[in-house]
Amino acid sequence: MLYQQIAKNKRKTVLVMAGFVFLAGLIGAAIGYAFMGSAQTGIIIAVVVGIVYMFVILGQSTDVVMSMNNAQEITEQQAPELWHIVEDMAMVGKVPMPRVFIIDDPSPNAFATGPDPEHAAVAATTGILQRLNREELEGVMAHEVSHIRNYDIRLQTYALALASVISFLANMGMNAMWWGGGRRDDRDNGNAGQVIMLLLSVLAIILGPLAASMAQMALSRNREYLADASAVELTRNPQGLINALRKISMSEPMQNADPSSASMYIANPFKDGSWTHLFDTHPPIEKRIDRLEHM
C-alpha cells in the first residue's frame, strides 16, 4: 500500500506538470494568434519568459527564504535532539545533512527549502520542539527530509515559474485587448472560423491564470501526500506523523511565517483554506491522516 501510494503520487505529479507546460504553451499560442498573427511566435515568447523566470526564482538562496521566515541557524549544541533527528533522517534518506534552523514561534510547524539536497535546509518552530515528543518529531523531520530527497522545492519552483509565465502572458494579452490590439484583418473579413479561433484565444487568456493557480495548488497538495508516504518509508512508523499532524491541526496560526512560503510548511501556517480546497496549498489534515492510517 505504501509503495502504491508513492507511485500514484508520482504519476499525478507528471500529469500536473504536463498540464502546466501545455497550459503555458496554449496561452502563448493564444497570445501569438490573437495579437501577433502567429501562434508559433507566442509559444517562443512563452519559452523565453519561462526560462528567465526559472533562473530568477532558482537564484533565490536558502538564506533569503530563512530570513523571510525569521529563522535562525543553529548548531548541534543548541538543539541536540532536533539536530540528531534530522541527521538520522538524512542518513536513512541517503541525502547530505541539511542546515538546521529554528523559528521563534509558539505554533508547531516546520518546513524544508533548497534547490537540491546539497543546498538544503530544514526549519522547525520553537512550538514544535516544545509540544511534540521524539516519535512525533521524527515523523515531521522525515516528512521534511522527504521533500529534500524528492526534489520538491525545485519542482515547486518550476511550477511557480510556469504559473508566473502564464500570468505574465495573460496580462500582456489583456493589455493588448484593452488598448485595441488584435488581428484586425481577421475581425474585418468576417471569416467565421477565424473569429471563433480569436474568441477561443481570448477565453484562454482570461481563464489561463485561474487554471494555472489551480494546477499549482494541486501539485503542492500532491507533493504533501508524497512526502507523508515517503516519511513513513523512512521511519516505518506512520503513527508518529499521525500524532504530530493531529497536534499541529489543533494549534494556533503562526506569527512569524512569510505568506509566500506558506506552501513549504508541513501544514498551512495560517490555518485558513478555501471551501472547495481547490486553491489550498495543503490537503486537509484529516485526509492526510486517513491515508497514513491505511498504510
From Swiss-Prot:
Cofactors demanded by this protein: Zn(2+)
Q: Can you say where in the cell this protein is located?
A: Cell membrane
Report which superkingdom the organism of origin falls in.
Answer: Bacteria
- Which keywords has UniProt assigned to this entry? Cell membrane, Hydrolase, Membrane, Metal-binding, Metalloprotease, Protease, Transmembrane, Transmembrane helix, Zinc
The membrane spanning regions, by residue number, are 15-35, 39-59, 159-179, 195-215
User: What intrachain disulfides are recorded?
Assistant: none
Q: Which membrane topology term applies here?
A: Multi-pass membrane protein
Q: What is its main location?
A: membrane
Cellular component GO terms held in the UniProt record = plasma membrane
**Single GO biological process annotation from the record:** proteolysis
- Does the record bear Repeat in its keywords? no
How is the cofactor bound, as the UniProt entry phrases it? Binds 1 zinc ion per subunit.
Q: Give the enzyme's main class according to its UniProt record, as a single word.
A: hydrolase
Q: Which CDD domains match?
A: M48B_Htpx_like (cd07340)
Identify the EC number(s): 3.4.24.-
Query: What positions does the entry give for Zn(2+) binding?
Result: H143, H147, E224
- The catalytic site is made up of E144
MF terms from GO for this chain are:
metalloendopeptidase activity; zinc ion binding
Q: Check the record and name the InterPro entries matching this protein.
A: HtpX_protease, Pept_M48_protease_HtpX, Peptidase_M48
- Family recorded in the similarity comment: Belongs to the peptidase M48B family.
Q: Which HAMAP family match?
A: Pept_M48_protease_HtpX
What is the protein's given name?
Protease HtpX homolog
Originating organism? Ligilactobacillus salivarius (strain UCC118)
